[in-house]
């Protein structure tokens, strides 16, 4: 019975590892494509009219890439839940971490999906008219959507909850001796760097707010690396953290 239970635990752990790796890759690949074809994420802080024009020129390929960016990270949802289930024996905060992590992923997905289902309509209205009133209405609608779904939901709440999840899980996995301290600190440090990118969001409403331009790119890249390494460890380790 013990052997069967152990085998089930190890199988669940390997599944979790593959979900982490596939989810991280699913985020990284469309992110990289968007940085090449749409100057993402720098484009987010350009003038609304410029963003709408560039988006329209990107056509269906750009819309599809944004959809992939929103959806291909979905394997992280069950991965977070499986990690949380395994971590509950080691921390009373595991359920809270899972709730925050899953919520963060969902609100980021909602924010990203605006580029697939709402922005195409606004860019079409903006580009295909010479009426200043229609252009102004499109810009106003886009600006409101951009600030709410993008800055508030996706970039602030989504990233903040993800950062908190990463720090909590790093501490729990270190406590469980699942991986070495350097891996735990990689998760924590990448999260703290990622947290500094929140300054860019405040700068959208507080002119002159100090911003470290590299924080978002560096923090998110280190976070993806941490996810992938954690996934590899879960696949390769012969012992779990039960």
Predicted regions and their residues:
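Hydrophobic, aromatic-enriched alpha-helical segments typical of multi-pass transmembrane helices
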Residues: 7-242
């Amino acid at each position: 019975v013990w052997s069967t239970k152990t085998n089930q635990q190890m199988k669940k752990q390997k599944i979790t590892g593959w979900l982490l790796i596939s989810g991280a890759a699913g985020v990284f690949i469309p992110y990289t494509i968007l940085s090449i074809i749409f100057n993402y994420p720098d484009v987010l802080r350009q003038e609304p009219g410029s963003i709408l024009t560039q988006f329209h020129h990107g056509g269906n390929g750009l819309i599809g890439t944004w959809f992939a960016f929103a959806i291909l990270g979905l394997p992280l949802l069950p991965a977070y839940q499986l990690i949380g289930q395994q971590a509950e024996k080691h921390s009373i905060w595991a359920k809270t971490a899972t709730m925050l992590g899953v919520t963060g992923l969902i609100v980021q997905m909602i924010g990203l999906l605006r580029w697939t289902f709402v922005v195409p309509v606004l860019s079409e209205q903006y580009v295909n008219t010479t009426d200043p009133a229609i252009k102004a209405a499109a810009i106003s609608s886009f600006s409101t959507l951009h600030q709410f779904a993008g800055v508030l939901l996706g970039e602030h709440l989504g990233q903040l909850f993800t950062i908190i999840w990463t720090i909590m899980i790093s501490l729990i996995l270190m406590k469980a001796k699942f991986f070495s301290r350097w891996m735990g600190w990689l998760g924590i440090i990448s999260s703290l760097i990622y947290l500094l990118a929140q300054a860019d969001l405040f700068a959208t409403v507080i002119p002159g707010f100090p911003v470290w331009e590299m924080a978002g790119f560096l923090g998110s890249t280190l976070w993806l690396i941490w996810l992938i390494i954690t996934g590899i460890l879960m696949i390769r380790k012969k012992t779990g953290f039960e």
